[in-house]
């Protein structure tokens, strides 16, 4: 089962990716993790990636595709994989197709922008322990304080409204066109496309995914 998750940052993909991995026994392939691992391993592709990254440039689509191909040939991907953070653009999706990387399911997590802003901007973190709260959906017992230690909660830089809105604009410009792309692929019988209502509670979204994936 080869799956791509689409959806804006904060749409709940991470939570459900965890569930899919456990339920169907497939690994999550994050291009960021993959690049770091390749650089660390010192492989031929890793060296190329390191040179590009050290020069402060973006790794080319060709190189990422080559890394994806190498990664999905590994033993733990024999039953499938879950692609996270890739493809981000239509040229990347085309390159994947040309490289013969086929996908069984494309799942779109649909959540309105304002709700995403609400979800992310309301997050509060206890940095030492990694505990995460939300001012509206999962508030601490005492406002602004960690339940266990009573220490101050903070807001991550990535969770500030300006940053979130910037990431959403980027998503709509670059990644949202993939929704149309994969809808057409599904019409042509090349993959299955499903839209999931990401505004629903976690358990309901999970049940919807089970229904789609079987």
From Swiss-Prot:
Region annotation (NMP) ranges: 30-59
Modified residues (N6-acetyllysine): 192
Molecular function terms, GO-annotated: adenylate kinase activity; ATP binding
Primary localization class, coarse: cytoplasm
One of the protein's GO biological processes: AMP salvage
A Pfam short name: ADK
E.C. code: 2.7.4.3
Protein origin, superkingdom: Bacteria
Pathway(s) it belongs to: Purine metabolism; AMP biosynthesis via salvage pathway; AMP from ADP: step 1/1
Keyword terms of this UniProt record: Acetylation, ATP-binding, Cytoplasm, Kinase, Nucleotide biosynthesis, Nucleotide-binding, Transferase
Region described as LID: spans on this chain: 122-159
Binding locations of ATP: 10-15, 123, 132-133, 200
Subcellular location(s) of the protein: Cytoplasm
Protein residues bound to AMP: 31, 36, 57-59, 85-88, 92, 156, 167
Coiled-coil region(s): none
Keyword Transferase: yes
Alphabetized InterPro entries for the sequence: Adenyl_kin_sub (IPR006259), Adenylat/UMP-CMP_kin (IPR000850), Adenylat_kinase_CS (IPR033690), Adenylate_kinase_lid-dom (IPR007862), P-loop_NTPase (IPR027417)
Keyword ATP-binding: yes
GO CC annotation, single: cytoplasm
Domain notes: Consists of three domains, a large central CORE domain and two small peripheral domains, NMPbind and LID, which undergo movements during catalysis. The LID domain closes over the site of phosphoryl transfer upon ATP binding. Assembling and dissambling the active center during each catalytic cycle provides an effective means to prevent ATP hydrolysis.
Subunit organization: Monomer.
Main function: Catalyzes the reversible transfer of the terminal phosphate group between ATP and AMP. Plays an important role in cellular energy homeostasis and in adenine nucleotide metabolism.
PANTHER family cross-referenced by the UniProt entry: NUCLEOTIDE KINASE
Family of this protein: Belongs to the adenylate kinase family.
Protein name: Adenylate kinase
Organism: Escherichia coli O45:K1 (strain S88 / ExPEC)
Gene field: adk
């Amino acid at each position: 089962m080869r799956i791509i998750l689409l959806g804006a940052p904060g749409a709940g993909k991470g939570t459900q990716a965890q569930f899919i991995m456990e339920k169907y026994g497939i690994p999550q392939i994050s291009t960021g993790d993959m690049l770091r691992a390749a650089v660390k391993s010192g492989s031929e592709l890793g060296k190329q990636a390191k040179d590009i990254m050290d020069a402060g440039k973006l790794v080319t689509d060709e190189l990422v595709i080559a890394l994806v191909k190498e990664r999905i040939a590994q033993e733990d991907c024999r039953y499938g994989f879950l692609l996270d953070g890739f493809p981000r653009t239509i040229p990347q999706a085309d390159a994947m197709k040309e490289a013969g990387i086929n996908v069984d399911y494309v799942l779109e997590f649909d959540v309105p922008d304002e709700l995403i802003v609400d979800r992310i901007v309301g997050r509060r973190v206890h940095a030492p322990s990694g505990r995460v709260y939300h001012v509206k959906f999962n508030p601490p017992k005492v406002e602004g304080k960690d339940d266990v230690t009573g220490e101050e909660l903070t807001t991550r830089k990535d969770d500030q409204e300006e940053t979130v809105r910037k990431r959403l604009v980027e998503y709509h410009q670059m990644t949202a066109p993939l929704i149309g792309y994969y809808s057409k692929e599904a019409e042509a019988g090349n993959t299955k496309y499903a839209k999931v209502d990401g505004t629903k509670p976690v358990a309901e979204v999970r049940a919807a995914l089970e229904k789609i994936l079987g």
